Amino acid sequence: GLVFYRYSGAQWDMLGMMFFNRELIVETWPILLGGLENTLLIFICSAVLSVTIAPIIAIIRTLNNPIFNCAIDAFVDVFRSLPILVLVIFIYYALPFLEINSTPFAAGVCGLFLSALAFMIEYFRAGIESVSRGHVEAARSLGLGVIQTMRFVILPLAIRVVLPPLTGHLVGLLKATA
């Protein structure tokens, strides 16, 4: 440490002035708050969209329809394997060739939404499939319909399984917006 301090060529006496300069902080504070606002808006938009649409697609995925399953599997495989940055750049620069113009904000939200949606579909599908058949059969024997069984029995039990990975992914999504 001392060798680095002595021979690095850094101006260590300027360190305090560079990092704790009140005038510099006052100048850059509005810029930082604007970036924080954009980060939170992109995160909230993409998180709300993906958390509301993922359970619906996961329920469709568990219906065992071969056409839907093939389409959903292809979507999940493609968008889980693409890096978020590549996806956002592709949306922003490739869609104008299809005469679909978007703002950088919309491209960011769309890219993060598609990436998060692919992961969250799998989280919700795994949560739904983790509910034991005994619970489903008990609900059906009590006279609950398919939709009522899904709403009152399967989804509340699946949320317990889904919540930890979903929370972790939302934290990662917030970090990815920056």
Task: List the model feature ranges, each with a label.
Residues G1-A178:
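Transmembrane alpha-helices and adjacent helix-loop boundaries
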